Amino acid sequence: MHKFYIYIILVFLALMPRVSASGQELRLPVVPDTLCAPHERAAYVVEHFWDNMCFADTALSHNREWMEQNFVNFLSVMPHAPAEAVDSAFANLLRHAGTNEGAIAVVYELAEQYLNEWQSPMYNQDFFISFLSAAVAEPSLGALYGDRSRYLLEVAQKNRPGNIATDFAFVQADGSEHTLHQWLKRPTLLVLYSADCDHCRKVIEQLKQHAALAAAVEQGTVNVLAVCIDDDMALWRSQLATMPKQWTVGFDGGKIMDNESYELSDLPAIYLLDADCRVRIKELHDLSALNDEKLRKML
């Protein structure tokens, strides 16, 4: 059944019209008949997706609407292709587009929008890392995009799922000092927040009302560690009474921000860690992932 859906997607992409304002089309590559397996055909499509694109034609390559539609189609095949094909596909795209400054600006903007913004339906950190790795390796992009790619790649690779979460120190209200690795004994929802952040307060309130999480905490199967990453201890202390007594609430004095040890582009930053301090979910945005069944499977 899975192979059937891959086949349908490839057929759909092959048949759908792709007409620009100038009436020209971006033709899909013709997959060789010798490639029969769906993943092989998907790999061929993504690797050769842009072969028929002339990036020197600025009526097309600078046309954001036209490029966006084709870029979305390009991304839609990637989940069905092997990882090495995805890497190759991004490298090919950037090699072609990198010769045109306006074109690479459009491509880069689309990659950030669709792959790195969590609100995007195509949000995918693995694909974004693949894109950034290809951008770092592509000499034609120049210093501007090369430097930005290196920075974003470093950020994206921090605390990836499967890796041990970066250690940090924090203090509790009673003055006791801990480190994450020393303190953590069981699966933990780590919440990094700012005391001066309205959105943080809203999300923390949602977590306080989350029935499955509250039950797991009550049963002792999950801990919640909420750490204020500001340097204003007085403000942090003034809000302690609003935090659930079953949670561990800490203060780090701004060191996580200073050290840039966690990605903090969107606060609160929420991570689900297992009992070995490995990241199971990075930057949890959808609280439905904390329902009973998913918690049991992940932890």
What are the functions of these language-model segments?
Residues 269-299:
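Thiol-/selenol-based redox modules, centered on thioredoxin-like
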Residues 240-275:
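Short, internal strand/loop/helix patches
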Residues 204-241, 254-259:
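Structural microenvironment flanking redox-active thiols in thiol-disulfide oxidoreductases
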Residues 178-209, 223-225:
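Short active-site neighborhood of thiol/selenol oxidoreductases, capturing the structured segment around
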Residues 1-26:
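Bacterial Sec-dependent N-terminal signal peptides
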Residues 21-173:
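Oxidative protein folding and maturation machinery
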